[in-house]
């Protein structure tokens, strides 16, 4: 998996101060996407063990609330294995940090994916330019914030 951005301090993508990872690769290609440079799977740099160590060193700080994973599309088949491994590692070493994940896929499509075991909050749904709104965490009214409680059938949607 490649990534186009690893931000040590992010206050725009989830609550508090967070670390954010922007993965490369997206086949959805939403019209009006805020990040079209992320569509190419080869854009940016390869996510390596060194990248993981760097990301974890950022999460080590007490004032960091968690990790936000955006894209691109983190749940593309090419990205999903690395995203799962990353989330599993973060939850193992930082169980009190939250993981937020943005996806252009709907919650019904992703709710049973293995990665969802590690996600605390998902922002789900494709960006639809005709439904554009100004929201702090998503860009169109069809998208949802879903806070997961550990029981996929007991999630809280915003």
Feature roles, as predicted:
Residues 2-29:
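N-terminal pre-triad scaffold of radical SAM enzymes
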Residues 60-69, 93-94, 123-133, 154-158:
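Conserved C-terminal portion of the radical SAM core fold
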Residues 77-83, 88-91, 132-158:
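P-loop/Walker A phosphate-binding loop and immediately adjacent motor/lid segment at beta-alpha junctions
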Residues 96, 118-119, 142:
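A generic structural signal for alpha->beta connector loops
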Residues 11, 113, 135-137:
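Short secondary-structure boundary/capping segments
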Residues 1-4, 17, 35-100, 107-112:
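Conserved Radical SAM active-site core
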Residues 53-60, 111-131:
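Structural recognition of alpha->loop->beta junctions
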């Amino acid at each position: 998996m490649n990534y186009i951005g690893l931000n040590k301090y992010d206050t725009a993508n989830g609550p508090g101060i967070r670390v954010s990872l922007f993965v490369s690769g997206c086949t959805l290609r939403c019209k009006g996407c805020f990040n079209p440079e992320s569509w190419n799977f080869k854009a940016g740099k390869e996510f390596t063990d060194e990248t993981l160590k760097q990301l974890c060193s950022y999460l080590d700080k007490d004032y960091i609330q968690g990790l936000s994973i955006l894209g691109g599309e983190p749940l593309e088949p090419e990205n999903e294995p690395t995203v799962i491994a990353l989330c599993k590692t973060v939850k193992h070493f930082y169980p009190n940090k939250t993981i937020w994940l943005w996806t252009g896929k709907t919650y019904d499509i992703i709710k049973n994916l293995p990665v969802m075991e590690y996600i605390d909050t998902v922002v789900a749904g494709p960006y639809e330019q005709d439904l554009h709104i100004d929201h702090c965490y998503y860009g169109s009214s069809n998208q949802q914030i879903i806070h997961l409680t550990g029981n996929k059938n007991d999630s809280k949607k915003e």
